[in-house]
Amino acid sequence: SEAGSQTADSTAGAATTETATGEPVQASYPLADGDKTITVYMKDATSGAVSDWNNIKAFQAAEEKLGVNIEFIMPAVGSESDQFNLMIASGEYPDVILWDFRSSAMNLEQLVDAGVLLNMDELIRTYAPNYLKVLEGNETFRKEGTADSGEYMALYSFSGRAPVSSGPAIRADLLKEYGLEMPATVDDWTNVLTVMKENGHAYPLTTGQNRDGSVWFELLLSTYDTSNSWCLDPATGEVVYGPVTENFRSYLRQLNDWYNAGLIDPEFMANDGTAMNAKLTDGRSVAGNLMLSYHIANITNAARETNPNFEFVGCPWPVLEEGEEPKLIFINGGQYYSGSQAAVTTACEDPVLATQVLDYFYSEEGNDLLCWGIEGESYTVNEDGTKQYTDNIMNNPDGKTPQEAILEYAIPLYNFSDVILNDSYVQMATTLPEQAAARDTWLDADLSRNMPKLTVASENQNDYSMIMNDITTYVQEMYIQFITGQADLDADWENYVNTVNGMGLENALEYEREAYELYQAR
C-alpha cells in the first residue's frame, strides 16, 4: 500500500532515525497528538479567491490524519516579492517557505549559505519516501529537483504532463462554413487565413502582449525549429540563442509575408488581453495561439450568447512539409516541469516533523486530497478506479463556477507541494469539450527538441541578467520591425546579429552552456 495511507502503528510520534538498511523511514500516522504546529509561508496562488487556506477541507482532513496543525502565512496579493524580501531580512522565519526560489532575489543555495534555509538533503533522503518515489519514477523530475552539487535542497512540486496551456486554435465553425480542412502545413495556414480575409474577417491572425509586456507569434516558432530565447541547435544539439539563427530569420520571413498580405492584425504589438479577446469574439480575427481558459473558454462563452455555432478548435502545431510530425519547442528558453519548492528554515524546531508533513502530500492519499478533496462530497470514484468531480462542483447549486466551487475542498489548479494530477487538472481547467480536445492535440507533438529551464551559476547571475535584459529588449524591438517591414530581413539582418553579439551574447551563451552541461551531469 502507499506510504501515505499506512496506519499500522497508531502511536503518535514519528520515527527519528533512519532504518538500519539505510532505506528512508516510512512514517506512521498520526505524527503528533495535535499539539504541534507547522507554519508555512507561501503566495496565495488563488489571488484572494480563498479567504483562509486553513478552511480548505483537504488541509483540515490532512491535519486530522497527521495530528499536526498547518498554519498558512500569506503575503498580501500584489506585493508578494516585497513582503518576501522583508520577511527574509527580518530574521524571523516560519517553519517552511513554499516559494519559487528560482525567481527570488536569492536562490535556494544562497539562502542555505545565508543561514535562512536548512540544507534538506539528509532530511529528504531519510524522511521523505513518498517524494523520493516521485523523483525515482521520472528522470526529468529527478534532474530538476537536484542541485548542481547533487543534493536535494527542497521538495519540488511537479506537473504530471508537459505544462501546455496554450496552442494554435482557429474557428471550427468558419472552417466548416467555407469548406476548409483543418490546417496542418504553413501553406495550409496561408490558404485558410487568405480565405478568411476574403470573407470579411479583417485580420485573421492576431496575438497580444504577455504578462511581461512581450509579444510573440508562438504559432510558428516550433515549425522553424527555433525559440525566442535559448534552444538546442537541431543540427549539432548545442545550446544556441534562437533569435540570431537562420531558422529564426526564416520564421520572421513567413510572418512578414503574412503581414504584407494583410493576414496579421496590424495592432498585434499593442493588444492587451481585452483588445485581443474583443477581436476574436466579434470575428475580426479568427485564429491565434490561444490559452485554454483565458481565450478559448472566455471568448466562446461570450460569443455564444449571440452565435450558438461559435466554436474554436485546437490545431496541430504547423509543419513545413505534409506528413511531418509536429514539434513543440517551449518559448522563453526551456520549460520547467516543476513549480514552487518547499524548504524548511533554520527557525524550525522540528525539521523532521516538517519534512514528514510535506512528504505526506506526495503519497497517493495526500495527493488525492489536494487534487480531488473529500470523497463523496467533492468527487466520486468510478468502477474502473478513475475519479470525477461531483455535481456539487461541476454544476454548483450556488452558481459558483467549478474553479470556484472546488476551492472549498481542494486546490487542483494550484500546486501546493504535490504532483499535479493530469485528470483533476483537465476536468477542472477544461469545462468545454473543445478545451480538453485542444490540449490533447497540442500535446501530440515531438517534445524532444526542448531544453530544460536552466539556472546560471550564482557568481555569474548578475552579469548574465544585465546582458540578457539589454538583449531581450533590443530583440523584441527588432522582432516587431522585421515583421512589419520597418527593418529589412536581407539588408538589416547582419547588423542586427552583430548588435546582439556586441551586447555580450558570447558571455551569456557561455554561462548558459555551462549550466546545461551541469544539468546533464546531474
Briefly describe each language-model feature range.
Residues K43, Y360-I480, Q486:
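Conserved small-residue motifs centered on glycine
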Residues P94-L98, P204, V286-M291:
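Paired acidic/hydrophobic, glycine-rich loop segments that form the ligand-binding mouth/hinge
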Residues A61, M291-S293, T300-N301, A429:
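Long, His/Glu/Asp-enriched segments that create or flank divalent metal/ion-associated functional microenvironments
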Residues K36, D44-K57, A162-A169, K176-M182, ...:
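Extracytoplasmic/periplasmic substrate-binding proteins
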Residues D121, A147-V215, W230-R284, A342-L353, ...:
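Helix-loop-helix "hinge/cap" segment bordering the ligand-binding cleft or interdomain interface
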Residues V77-S81, D188, N271-T274, L320-E322:
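Short acidic loop-to-helix transition motifs that present clustered carboxylates
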Residues S1-D188, W216, D225-C231, T236-P243, ...:
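Conserved N-terminal structural module of periplasmic/extracytoplasmic solute-binding proteins
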Residues D257-Y259, M276-I299, N307-F310, P316-P326, ...:
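Glycine-rich, aromatic-lined ligand/substrate-binding cores of catalytic
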